[in-house]
Amino acid sequence: METDYGSRKNVLALFRLDGRRALVTGGNRGLGRVIAEALAQAGADVAIVSRTLSDCRATAEELAASTNRRVVGIAADVSQSSDVERLAAAVEIELGQVDILVNSAGLNVRGAAEELSESDWDAVISTNLKAPFLCGRVFGPRMCRRGWGRIINLGSILSVIALPGRAPYASSKAGVLNLTRVLALEWAAKGVTVNAICPGPFATDMNKQLLNDPAAYQAFVAKIPVGRWGELHEIAGAALFLASDAASYVTGSALFVDGGWTAQ
């Protein structure tokens, strides 16, 4: 096969998302908000989804003002199939067909396994694993019919390692990683890529308990080869890459943004 080097695009243009429409669950705070902002900065119109309408609308207004893109807020419980169907209809009215789906809504309930309730388990699994499945099931086939799509699931370093006191969370994130791989295989031939971002420790609301405990915070730092927690902006580049044409040959992969933790 002869290589046509003259056909290569400007590499920076590959990262532009002009004309694309993205939906980010849990986009009102934490890593989801950072990802939503990055996609908008790259030219995408964005739908911010959370359970609380006031939260997602406030975030949407802030991001629209700072990025000069169309950003809307839509309330939905993405762990409920009826809400996901309603969400799909609503975002199509507001923005059009979704090209980029980011499943970043997350929940963590910490505690020893024998101390956790069944409802604790169900809540974490529903938010972290069931919701990406439901959203993928609705939006993925629509992307396939149009021949282009990007799905990014938020995994974790706990997709591949374990820590005490995190049975529901680690189980859900391990599931997310294999869900990502299965969907990638099912839709690879139809122009839709499915990948996971697996972050290490970041300063988000989910980690307030650790951030407020100096000993626990430093214990995590000691496990990270770069010697610090992640900063929120450091997730943005990973998301933009996987959402763009630059990653058209990347699917079924997990991108670890963890300061080297899982390299050990």
Region spans (language model):
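Short, small/polar-rich loop/turn modules that mediate ligand/substrate recognition or access, typified
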Residues: A188, T193, V250-G252
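Active-site helix of classical SDR
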Residues: G136, S172, T180
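Substrate-binding pocket helix/loop in short-chain dehydrogenase/reductase
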Residues: A112-A113, S117-I125, I151, F220
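C-terminal substrate-recognition "lid" of short-chain dehydrogenase/reductases
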Residues: G136, G140, W148, R228-T262
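Short C-terminal tail/terminal secondary-structure segment
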Residues: E2-A13, I161, A239-L240, T251-Q264
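Residue(s) in the substrate-gating loop at a strand-loop-helix junction
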Residues: S156
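Conserved glycine-rich cofactor-binding loop
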Residues: R21, N28-R29
